[in-house]
């Protein structure tokens, strides 16, 4: 298609024709004989408020990424051949460069898309259909040369095209809604009762207090929220919501107030919220697009003092409400927001993002489709996930679930992921009007079997990691090394099991030969027939579990939830941490400021460690808690998990007291203890498994003074290297974990703290710990606290106390 550029205007709208004219001018200035899709794409990208640039910014939020894309297009244009006549050389050229074949094909694709997408256009002849800018952009992005340039700059053409299509659909929806007659008093899309009930059910769920409702049309979402408010006013809701008060805020008319005005309004809001603490408050923020746009234009909202921003101040104060810092643990507070999918994607961007600051979870509601349902959305993608069948199967399998709360959350997440992946595979190839019949006739046996396999898998993982003390009947961690069954294996039998690499698993196959069966439980010892072939990932902790690709990808998705909170050392983060921790342990408030500084310093990357002579940034935090106030230690650890990682589910405690003792024992007890230490998982191995399962959390290691010598050495190496190694030689990175080593004090050098060289290896029954001396002599001239400090430092021969980032002495609680 070699037609001149002036003849193209007949097939384009005014805006699209203007873009093509600018592209022709660009080609003429560069001396190019033809206008290509590269010229058009470069022209559209140069417009600061253009649709293509906006879509690219949504795909990559960093503005320098778009600058890199512009440079890549510039390089691609420089590679195009120039004609003999060039205005840069003073040689005249043709007044209108011709349209290249690639651009002509793009026009045809856009015209075809335009014709298919409009009923009015289908009734017109092909030459009468005018191409709009949106369809031109989508067609240009399909061009191979444009896709190649975008790929070089780190962009994905299909992803950017999706953003453009979403923007077009939102614009159509808003135009249709605004053109509806107000006197009719009805929305274009009727509010479905099932959507309203799902929002109410979400409000009843205690685990999902802060959420944003996402949909393609804000009018539909707003209609659902108004219906919920009407039901609350009529008391047509569950008992827990009957006295709840709605507070709706409108920020669109907020303007640019001063700092005093903002603080006054926030104080009024806080007072209003506190006045309803007994009844409950639902704070409706409305459309979150105002916050997103205001943060993007942050520089224009700054006052004369460059260190203060109105929007950031409001966001942080609302975050305190969302995190429960104002109403406390007993307050009933919900945070609700509305957003289109386009807006919510931008809520997930920024450092830190609105999603992380407000602990937002997501609900999505379709604009028109009656086949979709309001359902939970993953934090990584805005997809509708149908989890009704999974919940039913979980209820049917409730008698088989015996794992802890932490593993239960991961199990449910993996089950929903498995269900959604199966449903996507079975329905993607069918038209919408056939999918409901496919679902009715779908055989559910496969899903049921998959759920049962997940139950077995997570029961095994939880038993091997979090419920190790429950294996006392297997002699692996029992202080008395006794079986409750009728027969007791000999020492040589247990030693044989240990040397052959036994694993405690939940075994359902009754035809295993190499197993020791406990009569009262279904736990068995399974000896792999081929050790080299039975190795699995450390996160499984079970060589008999079946890990397929879907399960592995689900575990990877779990690891992606590592929070990016509190990654900067600034006054705002420090104040937030201090306020939250002091509210939990006011009697230990003297320790809080230094503790918060330690966490922020480590997480911001300010601290470094030397590895092989090189300085390496560290993000993991190591703290040593000493003292008798066990309650304060755990409260601080749990609050750090809630603040930094978003939930108290990100807290795990490893306690040695279940399988360690430092008291004087008989010869038989000492022999059994040595056998137990050799055959059970050591303290450092339990820690390494916890890190491998999920490093992005707070790990409280209790009774560290009772840990064996090798475990203490392992902890010190983990502090120095940022990685922890298990007995198999596999390493796991600590990433940004917060590790708290806790003890009352290092009182005396017990057998557990002594190096292995001090222990006898001849197997004699003499109690070698009988005449153990204390680390220091008692000096009556020293105070009790000073004596404890000196005693602890002298007992720490390994240097663990000096290796951690900070040490904190907890004074006894006054209560």
Curated annotation (Swiss-Prot):
Pfam family, one: NBD_SMAX1
Motif, EAR: chain positions: 778-782
Keyword line: Repeat, Transcription, Transcription regulation
Induction of synthesis: Up-regulated by strigolactone treatment.
Cross-referenced PROSITE patterns: CLP_R
Tissue expression from the record: Expressed in roots and seedlings.
Phosphoprotein as UniProt keyword: no
Name recorded for this polypeptide: Protein SMAX1-LIKE 3
Organism this protein belongs to: Arabidopsis thaliana (Mouse-ear cress)
């Amino acid at each position: 298609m070699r037609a001149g550029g002036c003849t193209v205007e007949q097939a384009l709208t005014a805006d699209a024709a203007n873009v093509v004219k600018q592209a022709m001018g660009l080609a003429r200035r560069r001396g190019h004989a033809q206008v290509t899709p590269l010229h058009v794409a470069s022209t559209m990208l140069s417009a600061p408020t253009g649709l293509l640039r906006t879509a690219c910014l949504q795909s990559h939020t960093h503005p320098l990424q778009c600058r890199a894309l512009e440079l890549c297009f510039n390089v691609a244009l420089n590679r195009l051949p120039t004609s003999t006549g060039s205005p840069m050389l003073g040689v005249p050229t043709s007044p209108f460069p011709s349209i290249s074949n690639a651009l002509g094909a793009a026009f045809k694709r856009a015209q075809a898309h335009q014709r298919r997408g409009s009923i009015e256009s289908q009734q017109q002849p092909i030459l009468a259909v005018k191409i709009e800018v949106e369809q031109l952009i989508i067609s240009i992005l399909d061009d191979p040369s444009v896709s190649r340039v975008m790929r070089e700059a780190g962009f994905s053409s299909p992803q950017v095209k999706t953003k453009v299509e979403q923007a077009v659909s939102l614009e159509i929806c808003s135009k249709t809604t605004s053109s509806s007659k107000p006197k009719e008093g009805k929305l274009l899309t009727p509010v479905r009762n099932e959507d309203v009930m799902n929002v109410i059910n979400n409000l009843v769920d205690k685990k999902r207090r802060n959420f944003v409702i996402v949909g393609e049309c804000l009018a539909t979402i707003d209609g659902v929220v108004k219906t919920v408010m009407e039901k609350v006013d009529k008391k047509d809701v569950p008992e827990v919501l009957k006295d709840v008060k709605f507070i709706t805020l409108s920020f669109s008319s907020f303007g640019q107030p001063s700092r005093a005005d903002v603080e006054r309004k926030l104080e009024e809001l806080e007072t209003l919220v506190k006045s309803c603490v007994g009844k409950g408050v639902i704070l409706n923020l409305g459309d979150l697009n105002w916050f997103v746009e205001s943060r993007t234009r942050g520089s224009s909202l700054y006052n004369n003092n460059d260190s203060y921003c109105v929007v950031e101040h409001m966001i942080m104060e609302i975050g305190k409400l969302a995190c429960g810092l104002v109403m406390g643990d007993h307050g009933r507070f919900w945070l609700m927001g509305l957003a289109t999918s386009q807006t919510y994607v931008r809520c997930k961007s920024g450092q830190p993002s609105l999603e992380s600051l407000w602990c937002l979870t997501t609900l999505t509601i379709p604009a028109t489709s009656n086949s979709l349902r309001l359902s939970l959305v993953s934090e990584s993608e805005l997809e509708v996930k149908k989890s009704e069948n999974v919940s039913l199967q979980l209820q049917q399998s409730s008698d088989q679930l015996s794992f802890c709360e932490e593993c239960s959350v991961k199990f449910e997440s993996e089950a929903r992921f498995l269900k959604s992946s199966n449903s996507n595979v079975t329905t993607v190839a069918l038209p919408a009007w056939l999918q409901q019949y496919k679902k009715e006739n779908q055989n559910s046996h496969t899903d049921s079997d998959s759920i049962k396999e997940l139950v077995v898998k997570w029961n095994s993982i939880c038993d091997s990691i979090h419920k190790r003390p429950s294996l006392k009947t297997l002699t692996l961690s029992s202080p008395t090394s006794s079986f409750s069954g009728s027969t007791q294996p000999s020492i040589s039998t247990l030693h044989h099991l240990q040397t052959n690499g036994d694993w405690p698993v939940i075994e359902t196959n009754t035809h295993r030969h190499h197993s020791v069966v406990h009569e009262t439980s279904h736990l068995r010892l399974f000896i792999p027939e081929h050790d080299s072939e039975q190795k699995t990932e450390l996160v499984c902790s079970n060589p008999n579990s079946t890990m397929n690709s879907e399960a592995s990808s689900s575990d990877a998705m779990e690891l992606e939830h590592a929070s990016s909170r509190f990654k900067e050392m600034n006054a705002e983060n420090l104040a937030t941490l201090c306020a939250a921790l002091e509210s939990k342990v006011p009697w230990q408030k003297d320790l809080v400021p230094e503790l918060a500084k330690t966490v922020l310093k480590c997480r911001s990357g300010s601290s470094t460690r030397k590895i092989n002579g090189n300085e390496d940034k560290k993000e993991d935090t190591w703290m040593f808690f000493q003292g008798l106030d066990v309650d304060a230690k755990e409260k601080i650890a749990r609050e750090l998990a809630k603040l930094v990682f978003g939930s108290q589910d990100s807290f795990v405690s490893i306690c040695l007291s279940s399988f360690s003792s430092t008291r004087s024992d008989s010869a038989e007890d000492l022999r059994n203890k040595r056998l137990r230490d050799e055959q059970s998982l050591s303290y450092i191995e339990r820690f390494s498994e916890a890190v491998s399962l999920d490093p992005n959390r707070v790990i409280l290691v209790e009774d560290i003074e009772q840990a064996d010598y090798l475990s203490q050495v392992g902890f010190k190496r983990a502090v120095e290297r940022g990685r922890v190694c298990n007995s198999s030689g596999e390493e796991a990175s600590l990433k940004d974990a917060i590790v708290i080593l806790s003890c009352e004090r290092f009182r005396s050098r017990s057998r557990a703290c002594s190096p292995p060289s001090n222990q006898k290896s001849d197997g004699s029954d003499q109690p070698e710990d009988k005449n153990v001396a204390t680390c220091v002599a008692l000096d009556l001239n020293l105070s009790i606290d000073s004596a404890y400090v000196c005693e602890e430092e002298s007992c720490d021969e390994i240097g663990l106390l000096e290796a951690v980032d900070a040490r904190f002495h907890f004074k006894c609680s006054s209560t």
